[in-house]
Amino acid sequence: MSATDNALSRLRGAVHNQVRDFLRTPLIQAPMAGVATPQLAQAAMAAGAIGSLGVGGTSAEKIATLLDRQRELGAPSAHLNFFVHPRAQAARERELRWLEQLTPLFDELGVPAPTELSAPYPTFDDNPQLLELLLDQAVPLVSFHFGLPANAAIKALGRRGTTIMASATNPHEAQTLAAAGVDIIVAQGWEAGGHRSHFDTQPDTQLSTTKLVELLVRQCDCPIIAAGGISGPDDVQTMLALGASGVQVGTAFIPCPESAASPSHRIALADAVPVTQMTASFSGRPARALVNRYVQLLDPVVAQAPNYPITYAAHRALMAAVQQAAASQDPAAATHGDLAALWAGTGAGKSPVMPAAELVGWLMQ
């Protein structure tokens, strides 16, 4: 058997029957909150991959609407990804200092800066409606970022037959996930775009995807999914040859016509040499994004940023100000596409732009 066939066999053996029914290739389209859509997930699943929706920070009501849309498209239920970050701790003085850093940008837009901040959404365990939704709708595949929810939630999902995935950035985190009964571990390398899943109490060791996969394949009995910097067929085959049971690809799917990526995001990815950087300046947690003016201005003072996701509230207010200025046809707003959080991994700009189903085929050739 080829490395691809071996990987597919291992992955199919670990997932819910509803996923196994359509899974023909060991590839996961990454969740990517704000970018992944039911249409993108449906296209990936139609091509035999696992389609995903990032719903961290999304209400149960909105998630139910997304699942209804999946059904309207005639698609199986997508893999849903949730955030399980520590409960945000307010720090009024710190929040005010951060708002002072952003005030010049609000002034450019002619919109007052907020005078206070609060967490824009709760963590998974603080929103019991999320677990109720997953159990009621029997979602077949769920993943968690920034760690795991309470053990009671893991057990309840297991009794319902849900396949559980979670991300690890080092061997100790993987050990924690395996001990909790996680079915599949996503090995998130340093190259990955978007939020870093690191939840260990020790400093981040910044392991590359290749090194992390090598370590986890030897350590773990469950399937390991490689994630980070995977932008072409050679990258895919390298990871499968190392023993990964699949790959998770995100950045390559952002320019797909089925995604919800903004025009500025698509244009930035089309740059001749897109540059990415790990920064906590958008949300308060490290996340890899395309370098733009916001990163250049705020990353040098990121030590002052409030806790995640309170910092996110400040950036959301800034982007609302951009939209407000644009709605009023303020010429200043036209120059502020460089303030957005344009998530991307180190493989940015290295994949062809094509519909999602075609991209799955190209990656797995």
Tell me what each language-model feature is.
Residues 2-219:
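Active-site entrance/lid segments in N-terminal catalytic domains of soluble metabolic enzymes
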Residues 195-225, 230-365:
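Conserved active-site-proximal phosphate/metal-binding subdomains
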